[in-house]
Regions:
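Radical SAM enzyme [4Fe-4S]-AdoMet core and its adjacent flexible, acidic
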Residues: 1-152
Length: 152
């Protein structure tokens, strides 16, 4: 998902760099993730990465926030069908970190997103679709190829 969301990103390089920084005992790495309409659809994988890093390194901290720009990138732009996918991903992610006190902030943000998905009215799905069409055309790739299902 990182590669789709931010063209040019090579996830293995990002992960390798995070590990190299965490291995330096005098550094306290802070992994700060921006959750978008795309990444929330694979939230469980991001949490798996957080857990993997926390299990290997005690000096690492995590933070996440949700994107609101560009217009159409917020998870609140998802339609009913994709909100169900996101809700399931968030629920799975919360279960994975339930017994991890160091991930309290992450759990709180996930719960906030879960509430938003169920309470915030659907709006701007067309903007997300248009942005996705633009990305797919510009990058010669497909949302469907990355996620395994159609967005619209």
């Amino acid at each position: 998902v990182a590669e789709y969301q931010r063209k040019g990103t090579v996830w293995e390089t990002v992960k390798s760099n995070a590990i190299k920084l965490a291995e330096i005992e005098t550094i306290q790495p802070f992994i700060h993730s921006t959750v978008t309409a795309y990444s929330v659809l694979d939230m469980s994988s991001l949490i798996d990465f957080y857990i993997e890093m926390q299990d290997k390194f005690t000096n690492i901290k995590f933070m996440m926030h949700t994107a609101s720009n560009p217009l159409g990138m917020s998870y609140t732009c998802l339609d009913e069908r994709t909100r169900k996918i996101a809700a399931s991903q968030i629920s799975d992610a919360i279960k994975k970190i339930e017994s991890r006190p160091k991930m309290g902030r992450i759990k709180e943000e996930l719960r906030h997103m879960s509430q938003g998905i169920s309470l915030i009215p659907i709006k701007d799905f067309d903007k997300l679709c248009n942005l996705t069409k633009y990305f797919d055309a510009m990058r010669d790739e497909s949302f469907e190829d990355v996620f395994g299902y159609k967005l619209f």
